[in-house]
Curated annotation (Swiss-Prot):
This is Glycerol-3-phosphate dehydrogenase [NAD(P)+] 2. GO terms for molecular function: glycerol-3-phosphate dehydrogenase [NAD(P)+] activity; NAD binding. It is found in: Cytoplasm. It comes from Mycobacterium bovis (strain ATCC BAA-935 / AF2122/97). Transmembrane segments: none annotated. PROSITE patterns: NAD_G3PDH. Its main location: cytoplasm. InterPro entries: 6-PGluconate_DH-like_C_sf, 6PGD_dom2, G3P_DH_NAD-dep, G3P_DH_NAD-dep_C, G3P_DH_NAD-dep_N, NAD(P)-bd_dom_sf. Belongs to the NAD-dependent glycerol-3-phosphate dehydrogenase family. Pathway: Membrane lipid metabolism; glycerophospholipid metabolism.
Length: 334
């Protein structure tokens, strides 16, 4: 059975990477946190805060930050990859020669790669040559700011190697953060990649002043299309009914702390993609709707909500027009 390193490398000091580094440290681990910018690493080491990405969260002294990837990866048998989905490949190409042989590689990213239509675990295997059993995914209803406040939360650790999954589970079990293992990597990744798109749709509805009935319909019908895509790819439906599916979907669609929902609200209020992006950075769902829709098309899976979000984000359709389009679809059994 694979164990977990006494020092774990978390590659990416954004909100999610920093929050998970804190979880690992609070659970008793020694963590090296890689930041792209040296000033972010220096600030973490000197003040114990990361105000740019996770303001207000005091980071334990067992987290050491660095902007040197070689330093971060040296000797780590477990590497958490906390970079955006669309930059995963480029970062891994730089880091691959530095990765210790046999390391457990853990994706924290939620998305489908544009062009290749690969899930993140597939990108990791493709670039590093790792065995599928070496690759794990962490996903669930995990808003970074709430986790940083030590609010109770649960997540899924998915890996085909049960030993690696259990080792990660133990390393993350901090008292306020409860991990569950699952062998269904595909389902865990599809749930995470698709929920951001549905959260954009929920945000758009809020932005134009619609209420809870609309939000409930979007979440429920959004789940239906996520399950259709997941099962077409071989996912277990139970995974998508659990934390990595329904759980993540509800948190991301309903929380005002959700970046994808907040971005959708701006679009609903009439802001352009460009102006919304300047205010709060373009979110993962904007890119994911393009790659997920292409993936669904390749499997002949119908995803009308994803299609509507894609049209609003990339084809100039207004939110009102998207609603008219969805409500004008042919009626059918649930």
């Amino acid at each position: 059975m694979a164990g977990i390193a006494s020092t774990v490398a978390v590659m990416g000091a954004g909100a999610w990477g920093t929050a998970l580094a804190k979880v690992l440290a609070d659970a008793g681990g020694e963590v090296t946190l890689w930041a792209r910018r040296a000033e972010v690493a220096d600030q973490i080491n000197t003040t114990r805060y990361n105000p740019d990405y996770l303001p207000g969260a005091l980071l334990p002294p067992s987290i050491h930050a660095t902007a040197d990837a070689e330093e971060a990866l040296g000797g780590a048998s477990t590497v958490l990859l906390g970079v955006p989905a669309q930059t995963m490949r480029a970062n891994l190409e730089r880091w691959a020669p530095l990765l210790p042989e046999g390391a457990t590689l853990v994706s924290l990213a939620k998305g489908i790669e544009l062009g290749t239509l690969m899930r993140m675990s597939q990108v990791i295997i493709s670039v590093t040559g790792a065995e599928p059993a070496q690759v794990a995914v962490i996903s669930g209803p995990n808003l970074a700011s709430e986790i940083a406040e030590c609010q109770p939360a649960a997540t899924v650790v998915a890996c085909s190697d049960s030993g690696r999954a259990v080792a990660l589970q133990r390393a993350l079990n901090s008292g306020y953060f409860r991990p569950y293992t699952n062998a269904d990597v595909v389902g865990t990744e599809i749930g995470g990649a698709c929920k951001n798109i549905i959260a954009l749709a929920c945000g758009m509805a809020v932005g134009i002043g619609l209420g809870e009935n609309t939000a409930a319909a979007i979440i429920t019908r959004g789940l239906a299309e996520i399950i259709r895509l997941g099962t077409a790819l071989g996912a277990n439906g139970a995974t998508l009914a659990g934390l990595a599916g329904v759980g993540d979907l509800v948190a991301t669609c309903t929380s005002p702390r959700s970046r994808n929902r907040s971005f959708g609200e701006r679009l609903g209020r009439g802001e352009t993609l460009q102006s919304a992006g300047k205010a709060c950075h373009v979110v993962e769902g904007v890119t994911s709707c393009e790659s997920v829709l292409a993936l669904a098309s390749s499997y002949d899976v119908e995803m009308p909500l994803t299609d509507a979000v894609h049209r609003v984000c990339h084809k100039g359709l207004s939110v009102d027009e998207a609603i008219t389009l969805l409500l004008g679809r042919r009626t059918k059994p649930e």
